[in-house]
Amino acid sequence: MSFVPGQENAGGRSSSGNRAGNGILKKTTWADQTERGPNNQNRGRRNQPKQTATTQPNSGSVVPHYSWFSGITQFQKGKEFQFAEGQGVPIANGIPASEQKGYWYRHNRRSFKTPDGQQKQLLPRWYFYYLGTGPHAGASYGDSIEGVFWVANSQADTNTRSDIVERDPSSHEAIPTRFAPGTVLPQGFYVEGSGRSAPASRSGSRSQSRGPNNRARSSSNQRQPASTVKPDMAEEIAALVLAKLGKDAGQPKQVTKQSAKEVRQKILNKPRQKRTPNKQCPVQQCFGKRGPNQNFGGSEMLKLGTSDPQFPILAELAPTVGAFFFGSKLELVKKNSGGADEPTKDVYELQYSGAVRFDSTLPGFETIMKVLNENLNAYQKDGGADVVSPKPQRKGRRQAQEKKDEVDNVSVAKPKSSVQRNVSRELTPEDRSLLAQILDDGVVPDGLEDDSNV
């Protein structure tokens, strides 16, 4: 039994004639029941052979094979494409957990020439293929292949290939890529919003079922060339506009001190409950220092705020507005209006208490528990986020402090003893006779021995 992504209980013969590739029933018309020749199916155009790995050109603009999902495009240079263990497999209806295994394939897109004559290389785009399908259908899970990143669900058996049929673009659209809650998308990448292909028979069936009058009008429209949009046209136009303005498409916008200050002030002007902390306005500036009443946030998360790559995991636990009001205990408390010199105003606090319950079946449970344990009561740990480094002193203040330290370190001479003070005065006749007697006897009185050399 082969599975078809996007369809419930899909078998090897993936669908009957009245089911679209995305699993939605469509209206059966007369045109769907009649036999169609090659020309009718393609509305007068020549049959386009399905491109495979051997028939597609090497220009870099053709997507290898046909992935069931839209791609993930890189928009920042130097970023690495990777998922955490157990993450990275796109969600699709009808695919059991045992079949959720495969790899992401890097598609190197073509380069183009800017108006000033320079060659610009578009950043790569990644596509997902189930194990045993796609450009590396013969590879085993975990093989070291350039441009391949292996992913699998924790319940999948990676020793066997997936029982997934290949996608036929004429009958199945590419499914917009979605991941399980808690999945962390690689930094510098974004998910394409929808597939690039559409069934060729949809517009034909619609036009043939309108009646003879509209059929003539539609046949005249067939002579007009169909307008096609290349997958990379949007990127090319954006790059050309940026090149005309003298900017590099791959260069991130620089944040100056002035712009960061403006962003920070804009956030702080909002009510406290509407602030969103980020790099320019950290958590402690928005909500104050950590303590018993605000006990969440490690050092890294306090710096980055909601820009922290782990924050989307925590956002899965955040209650909705409805859950906040209807699932919490609320209490309205009136607070003091301030000092006597301030204008009188009524201040209230809407105090709330509640709980968010989850268990080990929640997708990404282990990662969520790890992030919670790292950030809950982190201020109590040694060297926690609440330890603030001292502000650097200004140059003038530092020099004054150094000069004061030098003055403090200078040793001041002690006052002379009474004997030392007496030696400096003139000797009286009595002193001279006493000194002569001492010299004759050869005895030096106590206290005068050390002072005789002064």
From Swiss-Prot:
What are the UniProt keywords, alphabetically? ADP-ribosylation, Host Golgi apparatus, Phosphoprotein, Ribonucleoprotein, RNA-binding, Transcription, Transcription regulation, Viral nucleoprotein, Virion
Q: What is its main location?
A: virion
Q: Which Pfam families match?
A: CoV_nucleocap (PF00937)
The post-translation modification note in this UniProt entry reads: ADP-ribosylated. The ADP-ribosylation is retained in the virion during infection.
Q: Mind telling me what this protein is named?
A: Nucleoprotein
Q: Where is this region: Dimerization?
A: 267-383
Q: Where is this region: RNA-binding?
A: 56-197
- The gene is N
